[in-house]
A protein has these predicted regions:
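N-terminal small-residue-enriched
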Residues: 1-158
Length: 158
């Protein structure tokens, strides 16, 4: 916000202090951040991936107050083996340390698959204030992170 921007060396505010209503105090809110499209074609990204889980449709999230550790769950995922989607997974999740996660991104799909995603219920404060946020991205690949699904792999696959 305008009051704290100078403390972190910024010449101007990022415009992140907002309020839900005229009768609430403004609070510093999450910035709407998007990832610029990369150069990968979606099919080429899948074909170039040997062993992974492609996750779709965000379901829930949790991040600590310092924004250091996080966990996200999705409604659906696809197991990828040898560059092919081989089966659907229910409620997959991923977790990690924020800086390690972002530094592990090695591929981002092109603008053909870029979408502006949003959440209508980012809440904070007392009394609670709820605001919508938006983040745009294309499918991307992140290496070496903990993933899990609601159902374990059958013993024959392990």
């Amino acid at each position: 916000n305008r009051e704290t921007a100078i403390n972190i060396g910024l010449a101007r505010s990022g415009g992140t202090m907002r309020t839900e209503n005229w009768n609430r105090l403004p609070m510093i809110r999450m910035t709407n951040i998007s990832i610029a499209p990369g150069t990968w074609r979606y099919d080429d990204l899948i074909a170039d991936t040997d062993d992974a889980v492609l996750m779709e449709t965000n379901r829930s999230w949790s991040i600590d107050d310092r924004r250091y550790q996080f966990q996200f769950s999705t409604e659906i995922g696809w197991e990828i083996k040898g560059g092919k989607k081989i089966r659907m997974l229910k409620n997959p999740s991923y977790s990690g340390i924020t800086t390690e996660f972002w530094n592990s991104c090695d591929a981002i799909c092109n603008a053909d698959h870029w979408t502006l995603w949003g959440t209508p219920n980012c809440g904070k404060g007392q009394p609670m204030q709820t605001m919508g946020t938006g983040h745009g991205a294309s499918p991307a690949r992140f290496r070496n992170h903990h993933t899990a699904a609601a159902f374990p792999r059958p013993a024959a696959d392990q």
